[in-house]
Amino acid sequence: MAGKRTRKINEGVDPTKLYALTTAIGMVKERAVAKFDETIEVSMNLGVDPRHADQMVRGVVNLPNGTGRTVRVAVFARGAKADEAKAAGADVVGAEDLVEIVQGGKIEFDRCIATPDMMPLVGRLGKVLGPRGMMPNPKVGTVTMDVAGAVKASKGGAVEFRVEKAGIVHAGIGKASFDAKALEENIRAFADAVIKAKPAGAKGNYVKRVAISSTMGPGVKIEVGSVTAAPTA
């Protein structure tokens, strides 16, 4: 039954063809037929080798229409900064007590923020947070004195990205319930951020391939130019 359903969902998607962005979005939305609101993900194959330090691609982008998911935020801070984080809507706030909780394996958050003075303490959690991509980093705005701003950005649609071994960078950029225009705006914002994060060591063709998919649906390949070009009115 599952195989039959998969074949039906895949019908009409030519894996050898490149589709215009707006067409691809429509195809993915049509095939997002699961009983839950599927996440729409974009993946970009880049002409970089992240094994070289000068070809690492990472950054953060604030999606104009949010991600559609509830993001739980933890903040490592003390005193007034801890109060600011709580007022901004942080789900978990602490210092040594929060370090102990995380070291114990209890990670009930999706994103982690810290004030600079907390980093010697948070550094102990590298083996726990690092593999999950949650280690606070000033390059993506998660080590900051503006904890309120960072919490609000995280809750409001900030998405971190980091290139993986095969030169692929990907992220969830919305839900199947989003209208096509909102998804298009989010995809363009993500692609623009990745392009702006092009490292000095990147040679030749930077964006090689782009595809989008839903959680349970097939990948639909997109014409790179239709993602990087300015949208038509």
Swiss-Prot record:
The keyword Ribonucleoprotein applies. SUPFAM superfamilies: Ribosomal protein L1. InterPro entries: Ribosom_uL1_bac-type (IPR005878), Ribosomal_uL1 (IPR002143), Ribosomal_uL1-like (IPR023674), Ribosomal_uL1/biogenesis (IPR028364), Ribosomal_uL1_3-a/b-sand (IPR016095), Ribosomal_uL1_CS (IPR023673). Keywords: Repressor, Ribonucleoprotein, Ribosomal protein, RNA-binding, rRNA-binding, Translation regulation, tRNA-binding. Gene3D superfamilies: 3.30.190.20, 3.40.50.790. One of its GO terms (cellular component) is cytosolic large ribosomal subunit. Part of the 50S ribosomal subunit. Belongs to the universal ribosomal protein uL1 family. This is Large ribosomal subunit protein uL1.
